[in-house]
Amino acid sequence: MWSRKDHMRIQSTLNGGFAEVSEEFAKQLIATGGWKVPRKPRNTKTKTAPEEPKNEE
């Protein structure tokens, strides 16, 4: 992710789009009700590969 320390990622409540703005501006936009702090992305669980059947002949 290309985030800077003094910037914050916010999400539009209208269309779900994202924007990265300064923390001060983000607070102002969130206060208007049109923007929110997005949820943190979930960690994806990796599935183990299925074992191949053992054919003993």
UniProtKB/Swiss-Prot annotation:
InterPro entries: DUF7302. It holds the Pfam family DUF7302. Residues 48-57 have a biased composition (Basic and acidic residues). It comes from the Viruses. Residues 33-57 are annotated as: Disordered. This is Gene 18 protein. It comes from Mycobacterium phage L5 (Mycobacteriophage L5). The lineage of its organism: Viruses, Duplodnaviria, Heunggongvirae, Uroviricota, Caudoviricetes. The gene is 18.
